């Protein structure tokens, strides 16, 4: 079945194929291409941020990584010991609650659509 040029599938028919975020399906979110792209960008940003926090560069001096004269490499989140603990806690929280916890959806008409009635749930799937 197609609608507006995109493929539409029942929410419960293939939950893992809708942008690979089944949790959103449970909330009845209508996924459009711009919304999917935004979700992908948020996931990439979070992944890069978390990768920085656990990178082995944190324990290396600048000379060991070929950056003589630059100084020690520290991500901004590690400016103090307290921030280090907070960053570690945040990393654990993200892994438990998912990458979109606390994120605001972009302003998009799809976000303002009413939720479908029970038994009529549909969402536009986008291939990632």
UniProtKB/Swiss-Prot annotation:
Query: What name appears for this protein in its UniProt entry?
Result: Saitohin
Q: Where is this region: Disordered?
A: 77-128
Report the main location listed first in the record.
cytoplasm
Work out whether the entry's keyword set contains Glycosyltransferase: no
Is the keyword Zinc in the record? no
Q: Which UniProt keywords apply?
A: Cytoplasm, Nucleus
Give the quaternary structure: Interacts with PRDX6.
Q: Where is the composition biased (Polar residues)?
A: 77-87
- Cite the source lineage: Eukaryota, Metazoa, Chordata, Craniata, Vertebrata
């Amino acid at each position: 079945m197609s609608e507006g040029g995109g493929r539409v599938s029942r929410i419960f028919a293939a939950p893992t194929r809708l942008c690979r975020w089944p949790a959103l399906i449970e909330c009845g979110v209508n996924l459009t291409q711009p919304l999917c792209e935004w979700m992908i960008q948020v996931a990439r940003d979070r992944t890069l941020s978390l990768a920085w926090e656990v990178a082995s560069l944190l324990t290396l001096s600048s000379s060991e990584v070929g950056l003589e004269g630059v100084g020690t490499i520290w991500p901004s989140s590690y400016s103090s010991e307290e921030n280090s603990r907070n960053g570690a806690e945040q990393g654990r929280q993200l892994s438990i609650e998912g990458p979109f916890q606390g994120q605001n959806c972009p302003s998009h008409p799809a976000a303002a659509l009413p939720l479908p009635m029970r038994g009529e749930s549909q969402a536009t799937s986008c291939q990632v």
